[in-house]
């Protein structure tokens, strides 16, 4: 081997190790950064009288999960909240823990390094800048409270004082009712605000909530084909108030299990081709959402 070639090889290995030490590793190398395709106001040309159930809407699974444990488990997204919104994401899957009376983003035991105050600030700024848009914000109590003397909902209410928040227990009927609003979907027990989505939520299956929201959330699978079949089945569901189709999954029949990065590598390229077959797409929640996902999602429906 020539000396020049050897130097290039050593430099390449060194660069890879630097990426690993910076916390990019497997997940970071897999994730694509957006080229900033702007879908920040894609709802502006949708008629006010369009029923909410008839609007195809992209979303992100575990919206704030940008960090992981050992670069293996925890991360589900590579784009910031602002980038996701500007790229067209309109369903946010926000998962929180109450700690010392403050709400912070977590994914399981992983601290996602974002306060709910900073999250709501960014969402409010986006909606005020883009009043043609609406957002559905699912809020899940991801972990039990610690060192707190108020309830999860008491804390939540303190962040939702702006009139942009739609906290009725009933879904808006039309886009007109929801424009410029953030519609709250409540995934925590004993909620008194927001559209209830805690009672009846089942683990790793497809189900219909009491308010006729259909959910496909089969995340424990043994093959990519199993997950693909579940996604297609949800596309074919008709007549529900809403339908929410999670693309997230991990395969349980291996060691270590395949987490979000490798599952997204299987599902995202496939869904970019498959989704064109369906006009009634409902709400589709992506892991590692990218510009190519959004271009494929909106093709033929905008």
Regions found by a protein language model. Name each.
Residues 137, 184, 284:
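A residue-level signal for conserved active-site and pocket-lining positions in enzyme catalytic cores
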Residues 98, 141-143, 188-190:
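Active-site-proximal loop/turn and secondary-structure-junction residues that shape catalytic pockets
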Residues 116-163:
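Catalytic cores of phosphodiester-bond-cleaving enzymes
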Residues 156-177, 283-302:
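C-terminal domain-boundary segment and adjacent tail
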